[in-house]
Amino acid sequence: MSRIGKRPIPVPAGVTVAIDGSAVTVKGPKGELSRVLPADIVVSQEGAELLVKRPSDEERHKALHGLTRTLVANMVEGVTTGFKRVLEITGVGYKAEIKPYGALLSLGFSHQIEYKAPQGVQITAPNPTTVVIEGASKEHVGQVAAEIRSLRKPEPYKGKGVKYQGEVVRRKAGKAGGK
């Protein structure tokens, strides 16, 4: 039995779960998420808990068991509390500005970059050097954060660029510069 897969998923009050074959839809205060799960894995609701079961101990079923349980648990957590990633922008003149369509980023290029936020993801900037990405889907929040970070990754000499909050950028010494 998978250590992760066998744990039941608690369903908080105010969250409804609809299971239709291999499709699971979770509705809550932060929105609605749907996902088609692997056909072999069975998700069932018993009271205020969801249980994930696998048909056999085949290697493939073992691998999908824990994955499916975590995907469903992330859906439940997403519609109740949501997910959040914080990006920090470092560098002279590097900044973020929030527009109705998403974010306008100045990252040291000759032009500003317009980043359009996908549906279900909100981008805010409490100050010009911090970008907060929030949403119900952990996958989408992480993907948006990774895409914005990839526009200008932190470089190792001065540390300029976009990094995750708490990320440690390994620094390098510059050239010796002697005669």
Curated annotation (Swiss-Prot):
SUPFAM superfamilies: Ribosomal protein L6 (SSF56053). The keyword Ribonucleoprotein applies. Pfam families: Ribosomal_L6. GO terms for molecular function: rRNA binding; structural constituent of ribosome. Keywords: Ribonucleoprotein, Ribosomal protein, RNA-binding, rRNA-binding. One of its GO terms (cellular component) is cytosolic large ribosomal subunit. PROSITE patterns: RIBOSOMAL_L6_1. The keyword RNA-binding applies. One of its GO terms (biological process) is cytoplasmic translation. It comes from the Bacteria. This protein binds to the 23S rRNA, and is important in its secondary structure. It is located near the subunit interface in the base of the L7/L12 stalk, and near the tRNA binding site of the peptidyltransferase center. Part of the 50S ribosomal subunit. NCBIfam families: L6_bact. Belongs to the universal ribosomal protein uL6 family. This is Large ribosomal subunit protein uL6.
